[in-house]
Amino acid sequence: MVAFFSPLREPLSLFRISTSPRSFRKVPHLLLLRQTSPCSSQSFSIIFISLSSSNSREGIVFTLSFLIFESNTLLFSSRKSFTLSAFPSGRTVKYTLALLPSLLSSTLVMLTTPKSVGAFSTTKLAIISFICSPSLSFFLLILYLLQHIFVLFKLFAVEYVRYELVYFLFLEYRTRQQSSRVLVVLYLPEHEKFRKSVLNLSVSVTILAVLQGILFYEKVIFTEFYDVEYSPPSSSYEF
């Protein structure tokens, strides 16, 4: 299932989730959203990856991602950050901890949602500290992601059987010409087999690495990607 929405021509008010019944429980679900400012070179992108087969709970996580994406102006208004500029070609990677206000409000939304639509009353929220640079190879990127994810697995080993996990990777990539902000949401389902399967985890992490690499060249790829008309299949859900 691949779902995407382009806010380049109209206000962001709706996004569609299209699924394939045969591959619904096998293929990781992807959501790509991108918002650009016509008056500047700033852009904000969000990647949502879900390995869940639950429509109702997945819809709540999509709603959470949508709220964060729609309120990104407030998200960056009062931030605390530090900059590392030791990378070649004058490139600077800026890592910002600015998710707490949005996470608090979004958590309240999830907790107050009726259980009939899959409220996340037992969801564990975790923020992964992560720094990335285009000079790093995909192999190093995967190692960094695996390191943080496995540390969290050890911390939540007892609770993981009962709780679902939502990981947030927030990256801000700056050059002299442009600024790109990326939020990656990784939703891991409550599944004993998945906890023991390193293969599935490696696949999802590889997807994260590839998508992150694509975002560094978003001017070339995403322009063509969003110019193509999208016709969803017969099986679709709207939030």
UniProtKB/Swiss-Prot annotation:
Protein name per the record: Uncharacterized protein aq_106
Question: What's the superkingdom here?
Answer: Bacteria
Cellular component terms (Gene Ontology): plasma membrane
Query: What lineage does UniProt assign to this protein's organism?
Result: Bacteria, Pseudomonadati, Aquificota, Aquificia, Aquificales
Give the UniProt subcellular location, in the record's own words.
Answer: Cell membrane
What keywords would UniProt list here?
A: Cell membrane, Membrane, Transmembrane, Transmembrane helix
Membrane-crossing ranges are: 125-144, 149-171, 197-216
This protein's membrane topology, according to the annotation, is: Multi-pass membrane protein
Chief location bin: membrane
Q: Which organism was this protein described from?
A: Aquifex aeolicus (strain VF5)
